[in-house]
Regions:
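Glycine-rich, charge-decorated loop segments at or immediately adjacent to ligand/cofactor-binding or catalytic sites
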Residues: 59-81
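Single conserved hydrophobic/aromatic residue that forms the stacking wall/gate
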Residues: 1-11
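A short, aliphatic-rich alpha-helical micro-motif
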Residues: 4, 20-21
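Structural motif
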Residues: 24-25
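Conserved anion/nucleotide-ligand pocket segment
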Residues: 81-154
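Glycine/threonine-rich flexible loop motifs
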Residues: 32-44
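A short helix->loop->beta-strand "cap" motif at the edges of active sites that frequently abuts
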Residues: 53-57
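Internal helical hairpin/lid segments
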Residues: 145-219
Length: 219
């Protein structure tokens, strides 16, 4: 709990009835990056679930999607549903957080087909054909636009022995492992804000640095 504000933690969990007992409206304002396993949309689902079950109105403040100019990747199979993938959508889904909330309602993905009382405050003058550069990093491990663009691809390495640079100044812009024998780049992950115990902490990793690639050549 945030003791200074009395706000509860809803990460990886649905808000409890006790937490919501004096609440009439919830305002959801998070910067998503348009990727299925970036878990802000899972948190959104849990919040919508709780709002639907407790007759609480939800206001979503929409934001541009920095990866909203394309759609890519396979659709999730329901048998693999988890907190890092809750819905049958592509890896890069192309929607803003407000559009995604509307889809959750429209597809009746909430428990028992419940519908959340939802109001989306839309973005003015935004369209998906224009790339949007984020003015503020959405999280400590996505510190710049290169990391945001590479995240949909490099995140798959997190299920392997490969480090994606957590615990460095360039997460999701490099990759490597102590077990790789060849590579043009070396780095050693350390404990940092947002990466207290990164993979291969304190161990030299060999791999590649992607910070200077032409991101357009990957699409």
């Amino acid at each position: 709990i945030d003791r200074s504000r009395g706000l509860g933690d809803v990460y990886k969990r649905q808000p409890s009835k006790d937490l919501l007992k004096d609440i009439e409206i919830i305002v959801f304002d998070l910067q998503d990056v348009g990727v299925r396993f970036y878990t802000y949309i899972s948190t959104l689902h849990y919040v919508m679930e709780a709002c639907a079950e407790n007759n609480i109105a939800l206001i979503v403040l929409d934001r541009p999607n920095p990866n909203g100019f394309y759609v890519d990747g396979p659709v999730l199979e329901n048998s693999f549903k988890s907190f890092v993938g809750m819905h049958p959508v592509p890896i890069v889904h192309g929607l803003t957080i407000g559009e995604y909330a509307t889809m959750i309602n429209g597809q009746k993905w909430l428990n028992n087909g419940n519908i959340c009382s939802l109001k989306v405050v839309t973005c003015l003058n935004y369209n998906h054909s224009i790339r949007y550069s984020l003015p503020i990093p959405p999280s400590p491990n996505l510190p710049n636009m290169m990391s945001v663009y590479l995240y949909p691809s490099l995140c798959f390495f997190e299920g392997t022995d490969i480090s994606v640079g957590r615990g460095t100044d360039f997460p999701f812009q490099v990759f490597g492992s102590p077990n790789l024998k060849e590579g043009k780049f070396k780095f050693t992950p350390i404990s940092k804000f947002g990466a207290k115990n990164p993979k291969h902490k304190g161990v030299l990793c060999v791999g590649n640095d992607l910070r200077n690639i032409n991101i357009d050549s990957l699409n």
